[in-house]
Amino acid sequence: MNKGNDKLVERLRSNTERGSILWRLVRPVVRPVWSLIHNRDYVSNYDRDYYLYHSCVLPPRELRGRLGVSFLADGFYLESGIAEARRLAARLAYSKSSLVVDIGCGLGRLATGMLWEFGDVQYFGIDSNPTFAEWCQEHIERNHPSFRFIHLDVVNELYNPTGKIDGDRIRLPLADATADIVYLWGLFTNMGPEHVRIYVSEMSRIAREGSRIFLTAFVEENVPEVSFIPKGYVPYECVKPLQCVRYSKEFLFSIFSRYGLVVEEFRHHGGAFPSQSEVYLRKEKVAA
C-alpha cells in the first residue's frame, strides 16, 4: 500500500483500539441501549434510512452498529471504506476493467469507498444478511447499476440464523474464472473450518488464473488449529462461538494451498481492527 494509505490505516487502527478501550469502560452503563440497537429489527419505513456524509450515502447507524461500535462514526465508516478501495489499486492490481467480488460485503463499505475513489466500476457484493443486502440494493445498486448486490440465504449464526442454505452446500452465483479480485474482509473471523474450506474452494473456482485475493482472519502460530473465542484474544465481549474464530497459520495456509492459492504476503495483526491479520493470495496459473 502507498504511504498515504498506510498512514490512514494506522490512524484507523489507533481509533479502533481507543474505541475498544473506551467501550469496555462505558459498556456497563450503555449496554442496555447498545443491545436494543444491535438486536432491533430493521424497519423499512424509517423517516430516513440513510445518512449523507460529505455527499456520500451511508447506512443508518442502527445498521452500522451491528458491524461494530467503530462503524457508528460516519467519518470512520467512510474513511475505512476509502482505505480498502485504495488497497485494491495499490496491492491487488486493480484497474477500471477489473471485476471485484466482495464476499461478505455487509453494508457495502468497500463499495462506498470504491465509488469515492473510482466512480462507477464493476463490483459484485454477496452477503448472508438480508437486511444488509436490501439496503445496498436500494441505496447503492439502484443509483449505480454496475454495482450489484445479492442476498445469499446461507445459514450464519451471527447474521442469518434462519437461512435456508447450509454452508456445506454453498455455491457462489458466479461462473468459473470470472473474478479479477476476490475480497473477504472479516469473513473468516466469524466462520468455522468446515465452511472456510467450502469458501476457499469457491473463491478459487471463481478467480481467474493470476488474479488476486485479499482476506482478513485471526491467525497465529503455535496455537490449536481452530479456537472459538480464545480467552482474552480480542478487546470486546463475545457471547457466541462464531464471534471470534482463530486459526493456526499452518492449518489455514494448508487450506489455501490445497485449492491452488499462493500466499504472497502475510501481515500479522496488520489490519485496522484488533488482532486481525491480512493475507494476500494469488490464484496460480495452470501450466500448459
Label each PLM-derived region with a short phrase:
Residues R197-E209:
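A short glycine-rich, Lys/Arg-flanked "PGG" loop and its adjoining helix->strand segment in the class I
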Residues G192-P193:
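Helix-capping/helix-break motifs at membrane-protein junctions
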Residues G104:
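Conserved S-adenosyl-L-methionine
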Residues G186-L187:
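Short catalytic micro-motifs in class I SAM-dependent methyltransferases
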Residues Y183:
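A conserved beta-strand element that flanks and buttresses the S-adenosyl-L-methionine
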Residues N2-R91, K96, L107-M114, Q122-R171, ...:
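Class I (Rossmann-like) S-adenosyl-L-methionine-dependent methyltransferase catalytic domain
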